[in-house]
């Protein structure tokens, strides 16, 4: 049972994105699959049941729950994805990292085979007819609908295929094979985006981690020269179709964010403390909708309930405004004390109506 629940109904989400005075701040509380092996399941379910604003569709399951994990999040079971990258993880539910890069030897590029975007999402098979039917079903229910590129669609995918250091050196050296690889990745991504648009989704989400704890994973100059043009090509059909564009990156992206959002990004999803709450507020408040990722490194795992409450309020006061432009999301992972989990759920519920 993996829970990723948003408290935002369709109209409230649209009002928040468009700065049209939403009735409340949309809140999403995501519980990572690993949590169900880490915490007492009933204790976690009790917290969910006690917070219906965050979990409006909650139905208590029988325990112990039968758990299933994504193919690249299974402990000690290496997984080879459709690009030939081999993933490994040490904990069930935690997405692993790529340990084997199919083009560690670039001399093999001529024989390297790409997955077919008509059949693959990159991390597994896709049935586009079933996708269209599911989008239609959700629309009929009045729900917001999404088309999600796989996480790490371009730069991270290049690093997974080639290896991080080799990828950066290849870009610096303008290696023709790697430039061609990026072009093929862009075409693969565009094929999937076109399927999202054919299905008439409301929001296209384009997630890729570009930041480290301090600074970006790629220099701003290399990003502007090689990655940004591909981003712009992927955004163009979405903009033309009038769809909402949601961009995500973890890490410190302050030196990249102007280039990331240039050209019509409607929502930027970034992390609070690593970028600085004050900086985020100065940069985006009242201008671009922020889907703010609440701290998972410092305050929620190691702070007090009072500090958690104060942090959520500070984020809302600094980044939000009465007109909207703010959503908040938290990802729960093993290690956060249950009293802090409760404190965060309480704060997200309490302050959602801060401007009303």
Where are these regions (language model features)?
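Active-site loop segments of alpha/beta catalytic cores
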Residues: 1-41, 80, 89, 114-356
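Segments that shape or occlude catalytic/ligand-binding pockets
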Residues: 34-72
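A contiguous, low-structure linker/loop signature
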Residues: 70-120, 140-144
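Secondary-structure transition motif
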Residues: 27, 53-58, 80-85
